[in-house]
């Protein structure tokens, strides 16, 4: 794997985490618009990461509200 690909994945991961946090805060996120220009491989990877981070953010928010 070349360095450009690693940086690209890190950037996509950061974006997926950021959009998930926005979603958990109640801000609408149009994931179709976000991923619209991605090729299928990157879109699939991004959506899986986004779903994971949405789940984590929702759990964290729920725990925060319990305490």
UniProtKB/Swiss-Prot annotation:
GO terms for biological process: negative regulation of bacterial-type flagellum-dependent cell motility; negative regulation of single-species biofilm formation. Transmembrane segments: none annotated. InterPro entries: GlgS (IPR015065), GlgS_sf (IPR036295). Belongs to the GlgS family. Major determinant of cell surface composition. Negatively regulates motility, adhesion and synthesis of biofilm exopolysaccharides. This is Surface composition regulator. It comes from Salmonella typhimurium (strain LT2 / SGSC1412 / ATCC 700720).
């Amino acid at each position: 794997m070349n360095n450009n690909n690693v940086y690209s994945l890190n950037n996509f991961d950061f974006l997926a985490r950021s959009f998930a946090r926005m979603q958990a805060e109640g801000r609408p996120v149009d994931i179709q618009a976000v991923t619209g220009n991605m090729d299928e491989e990157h879109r699939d990877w991004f959506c899986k990461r986004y779903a994971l981070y949405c789940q984590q953010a929702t759990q964290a928010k729920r725990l925060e509200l319990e305490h």
